[in-house]
């Protein structure tokens, strides 16, 4: 434990430039990247304010209205979700309901296009 206490004392005495150099050396030695943690540590309280400005990476595909071609929408919901006929029909009739949750932007856009082509109204959240 005495060795760990000495390491902590030595690290506490480093300047900001020395700490940055240490970080780079450790990244090279261990083959990792500390980009996000360093940015959060450097930004401090500003990180919380910047969080809403970050681009979302996960989206929910929400069916808001089945439209006039409900059968086509049910077919697309089944294809997207893998649900059975009854479950897909119940989901479509209970709109607004999420069809897929936590999907990538590319997948969300693809699912939205498929559902809209079938006659549904869809939102991405």
Swiss-Prot record:
Which GO cellular component term is one of those annotated? cytosolic large ribosomal subunit
List the Gene Ontology MF annotations in alphabetical order: mRNA binding; structural constituent of ribosome
Q: Which InterPro entries match?
A: Ribosomal_bL12, Ribosomal_bL12_C, Ribosomal_bL12_C/ClpS-like, Ribosomal_bL12_oligo, Ribosomal_bL12_oligo_N_sf
Q: Which domain of life is it from?
A: Bacteria
Query: What does the subunit section of this Swiss-Prot or TrEMBL entry state?
Result: Homodimer. Part of the ribosomal stalk of the 50S ribosomal subunit. Forms a multimeric L10(L12)X complex, where L10 forms an elongated spine to which 2 to 4 L12 dimers bind in a sequential fashion. Binds GTP-bound translation factors.
Q: What does this protein do?
A: Forms part of the ribosomal stalk which helps the ribosome interact with GTP-bound translation factors. Is thus essential for accurate translation.
State the PANTHER family in the record. Answer: 39S RIBOSOMAL PROTEIN L12 (PTHR45987), LARGE RIBOSOMAL SUBUNIT PROTEIN BL12M (PTHR45987:SF4)
What is stated as this protein's family in its record?
A: Belongs to the bacterial ribosomal protein bL12 family.
Q: What is this protein called?
A: Large ribosomal subunit protein bL12
Specify the species. Answer: Mesorhizobium japonicum (strain LMG 29417 / CECT 9101 / MAFF 303099)
The gene behind this protein is rplL
């Amino acid at each position: 434990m005495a060795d760990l206490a000495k390491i902590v004392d030595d690290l506490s005495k480093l300047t900001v430039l020395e700490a940055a150099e240490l970080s780079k050396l450790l990244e090279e030695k261990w083959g990792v990247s500390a980009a996000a943690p360093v940015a959060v540590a450097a930004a401090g309280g500003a990180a919380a304010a910047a969080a809403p400005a970050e681009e979302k990476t996960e989206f929910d595909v929400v069916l808001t209205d089945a439209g006039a071609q409900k059968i086509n929408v049910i077919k697309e919901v089944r294809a997207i979700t893998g649900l059975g006929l009854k479950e897909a029909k119940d989901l479509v009739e209970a709109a607004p309901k999420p069809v897929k949750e936590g999907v990538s932007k590319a997948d969300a856009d693809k699912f939205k296009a498929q559902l809209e082509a079938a006659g549904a109204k869809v939102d991405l959240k």
